[in-house]
Amino acid sequence: MKIHKFILIATIIVTLFETTGCTSINNSKKLRDLGLEYQYIEIQKPRINRAHILRADLKNPNIKPSIIVAKDPDGSGPAEAELTNPFELANKNEVLAFINTNPWDSFPNKEGKRNRNWFEGQPVDIDGLAISGGKIRSNTQPRESSIWLNNEGQLILGGKPENEKVQEAMNGFQLITKEGNIIVSPDNSIHPRTAIGTNKNGTLIWLVVVDGRQKGYSEGMNLYELASLMADLGCWNATNMDGGGSSVMGMIGADGKIKLMNSPSDRFLGLKKIRPLPMILSIEKRVN
């Protein structure tokens, strides 16, 4: 696998109760014993960027990935979820970390216009598979950008086999690395990014958020740069998830509460604003 050293300029592995920005992170031996490791990296070229990386070892019997979907506002109606603060979705004692997942869209009004000024409680249509605890919320034909958990506890990037009942599933936009190779080309689409990657057998996963649209702090990546980062981390396969103002990562802090790790690009009156989401991928402590 080619190593793209121009991307990984500086790496900081955060240790017990150190800080990244103003957030105190409990990346202690306790979390490492659960198979979790958080990294914060600063990238200088081709433009300044800050990335947040959580690696989870799914062979560890004490953790599991879970999809958490927001409330369905209309039952059998067209809406599949209502937008909800992701920290509210993650408000469970078992949650250790989370990131955003699927893209979505609002519904058109009588004039055919869609309200994309996202707000909490807004009914939306989730794009792609959304399955939580075996319950299907968004049921579309699995495709290459689908991500699902198989019966052996491995995270698989790609369409699901017909003979396996899937308990957890989500969807991104497209694969960006496949079998260790970058499969996207450089372009000028520079945005905040969220990506999910796995090793060859799906037992190690990387959850990655790259901040963007913040000049001089973190400006964003194109898909080729994101794929290069995922390849450098060791991903065999990686998928580009919803990004932009949706890109968010939360992780348990030293006080046991979930903390915001990154700097989302949405703003309200100049202040950082967390975009409401229809669903998240969480890493949870397994409860026997």
Placement of each model-derived feature along the sequence:
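Extracytoplasmic
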Residues: 49-51, 92-94, 142-144, 171, ...
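Active-site-adjacent helix-turn-beta-strand microarchitecture at beta-sheet edges
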Residues: 104-188
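Conserved, well-ordered active-site substructure
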Residues: 109-135, 182-200, 204-237, 246-288
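Bacterial N-terminal signal peptides that target proteins for export
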Residues: 1-8
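Zymogen propeptides
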Residues: 21-139
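Short, solvent-exposed aromatic-acidic interface loops
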Residues: 68-75, 161-165, 209-215
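Hydrophobic core
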Residues: 12-19
